[in-house]
Amino acid sequence: MKRPWGKAVVKDPNPKITVHGFNNLTKSLSFNIFDIAYAKTEQHRQEYIEYIDELYNAERLTEILTNVTNIIGANILNVARQDYEPQGASVTMLIAEHETPPVGTDWDEEGPGPLPETVVAHLDKSHVTVHTYPESHPDNGISTFRVDVDVSTCGVISPLRALNYLIHSFDSDIVTVDYRVRGMTRDLDGTKHYIDHDINSIQNFLTEDTQNAYQMIDVNVYQENIFHTKMLLKDFDIDNYLFGAGRDEFAQTELDQIEERMKTEMLEIFYSRNLG
């Protein structure tokens, strides 16, 4: 399933706050990513689960999270990973900031991070985790694959740098993104700061191509430094969603019914409510 790519255009950096001691702000970025498919038979549904389970096994997820830590400019301290039976996998990494971030790096700049083609901290609270949840409907043939990713950093490194990479690392039909900043830090005058960068929407940290490819809605609570964005892929081509069979194996009326069910499934996940 081909997904939109695009070149990240990094915005001008925000004025930096010179802090007293260590930057104690905790920045947390959480993803729920859904990939949807239609598997006609019970055999196809089982093959889909096995395919997804192998494609995103613990080894592959470790590779993705390793790239995430490189993108945000962190060091890996420890890795714990596990494949589960009958399906699913999880990986947890403890990460820390570089001891001395090189001058001129953009790890602490809030802007679109790199895409894949360009590529738990026992420091405090910094960690990266991922869990996978393959499942299928026993009757109507719809199968879903959910990935939960959490990136939490304490200090100057920003999890938003990994935003574009993570979206394009999976076949992302629906994406729910949450970003929050917690704690406080002080500048040299002793003034407390509860956030150290400007942000009015998570959408500002996506490439233009990604913004154009997805329908997006925001629910933000600015005074609490909570930002929430939902994303639904705009273009729908049934050929991209048929697993184990081509369109020539279906009558046109059946294809129309499948497409309607698939779109309903995606809308229900997007809005987090049943529409039927």
Swiss-Prot record:
Query: Where does this protein act, in terms of pathway?
Result: Amine and polyamine biosynthesis; S-adenosylmethioninamine biosynthesis; S-adenosylmethioninamine from S-adenosyl-L-methionine: step 1/1
Q: What EC number(s) is this enzyme filed under?
A: 4.1.1.50
Required co-factor? Answer: pyruvate
Q: Name one GO biological process term.
A: spermidine biosynthetic process
Q: What class of enzyme is it?
A: lyase
Q: Which reaction does it catalyse?
A: S-adenosyl-L-methionine + H(+) = S-adenosyl 3-(methylsulfanyl)propylamine + CO2
Give the site residues for Cleavage (non-hydrolytic): K125, S126
Give the domain of life.
Answer: Bacteria
User: What is one term from the GO cellular component aspect held by the record?
Assistant: cytosol
Quote the protein name from its UniProt record: S-adenosylmethionine decarboxylase proenzyme
Q: Name one GO molecular function term.
A: adenosylmethionine decarboxylase activity
Q: Which NCBIfam families match?
A: SAM_DCase_Eco (TIGR03331)
Post-translational modification note = Is synthesized initially as an inactive proenzyme. Formation of the active enzyme involves a self-maturation process in which the active site pyruvoyl group is generated from an internal serine residue via an autocatalytic post-translational modification. Two non-identical subunits are generated from the proenzyme in this reaction, and the pyruvate is formed at the N-terminus of the alpha chain, which is derived from the carboxyl end of the proenzyme.
Cite the active-site annotation: S126, H131, C154
Residues annotated with Pyruvic acid (Ser) modification? S126
What species was this sequence derived from?
Alcanivorax borkumensis (strain ATCC 700651 / DSM 11573 / NCIMB 13689 / SK2)
What does the record note on quaternary structure?
Heterooctamer of four alpha and four beta chains arranged as a tetramer of alpha/beta heterodimers.
Q: What does this protein do?
A: Catalyzes the decarboxylation of S-adenosylmethionine to S-adenosylmethioninamine (dcAdoMet), the propylamine donor required for the synthesis of the polyamines spermine and spermidine from the diamine putrescine.
